[in-house]
UniProtKB/Swiss-Prot annotation:
Any Pfam family: ATP-synt
Location, primary (coarse class): membrane
Protein name: ATP synthase gamma chain
Assembly notes: F-type ATPases have 2 components, CF(1) - the catalytic core - and CF(0) - the membrane proton channel. CF(1) has five subunits: alpha(3), beta(3), gamma(1), delta(1), epsilon(1). CF(0) has three main subunits: a, b and c.
Localization (cell): Cell inner membrane
Gene Ontology molecular function, alphabetical: ATP binding; proton-transporting ATP synthase activity, rotational mechanism
Length: 291
């Protein structure tokens, strides 16, 4: 059994670790609230663009934007959204497992793939498995800006428009609530009809005609590009909210485990100290009896 000095050192070490995990838990909780607000504030923008784009697309049925052209999938692009940092539980592991399954399915169908990595963890993973990475963006910080994402996203959008790839998929972690996050792989392009179909209420709200400047086609082109960019930004915002939630939960679990370990070590320390005192008393009593 270890001596009391070694046990005291171990207790001190675990206490110091617990201070770190507790501080990280509090920081993650603060960042989580801001990330959730950012995620919620991004939703109305994407929804408003979708409504306007849907109205204009239905008002001009003779024009079909390249993003809406459906082709047989022989080549595909995959945008992978992960975190830049670790210590967030199984968040990255789960979404990268979904990415692996998607890549395997594409490979089994004879579909070539190219990837865009958003986040260091995804970039490292794609490099390890030998995936073809055509663009990436890392170190977004706690406040992602669309300007930083556009360059990496544009590579995939341009490839789809040029017919170099026939579909684009988006992999990220969807935020459900603080305790639950869900890895998803969604089709980003071509845009499906249900994404640009208006409900009866939306048709009522957007029943007017527009005056286009310079022309309807140019406006629809720009709107759909902004809409797809907004979808990717929303995915990044949800991924960041998921990251901070997962990190807060992971650090809380680490702090609770450290507390339990400290309690167990304290018990061992007390038993060891008691055994040492009992031994000393026995030696004293034995020595006195011998005299």
């Amino acid at each position: 059994m270890a001596g009391t000095k070694e046990i005291r050192t171990k207790i001190k070490s675990v206490q110091n670790t617990r201070k770190i995990t507790k501080a990280m838990e509090m920081v993650a909780a603060s960042k989580m609230r801001r990330a959730q607000e950012r995620m919620r504030s991004a939703r109305p923008y994407a929804e408003k663009i979708r409504n306007v784009a849907a109205h204009m697309a239905q008002a001009n049925p003779e024009y079909q934007h390249p993003f809406m052209v459906k082709r047989d999938v022989k080549r595909a692009g995959l945008i992978v959204v992960t975190t830049d940092k670790g210590l967030c539980g199984g968040l990255n592991t789960n979404v990268l497992r979904a990415v692996t399954n998607q890549l395997r399915d594409l490979q089994n169908k004879g579909v070539e793939s190219q990837a865009t990595a958003i986040g260091s963890k995804g970039m490292q993973f794609l490099g390890r498995i030998g995936a073809k990475v055509v663009s990436n963006v890392v170190h977004l910080g706690d406040t992602p800006h669309l300007e930083k994402l556009i360059g990496a996203i544009k590579v995939q959008l341009d490839a789809f428009t040029a017919g170099e790839i026939d579909a684009v998929y988006l992999a990220y972690t969807r935020f459900i609530n603080t305790m639950r996050q869900e890895p998803v792989v969604e089709q980003l392009l071509p845009l499906t009809a249900d994404k640009l179909t208006q409900t009866a209420a939306e048709k009522q709200a957007y029943s007017w005609d527009y005056i286009y400047e310079p022309d309807a086609q140019t406006v629809v082109d720009e709107l759909l590009i902004r809409y797809v960019e907004a979808l990717v930004y929303q995915a990044v915002a949800e991924n960041m909210a998921s990251e901070q939630s997962a990190r807060m939960v992971a650090m809380k679990a680490a702090s609770d485990n450290a507390k339990n370990v400290i309690g167990e070590l304290q018990l061992v320390y007390n038993k060891t100290r008691q055994a040492a005192i009992t031994k000393e008393l026995s030696e004293i009593v034995g020595g006195a009896a011998a005299v």
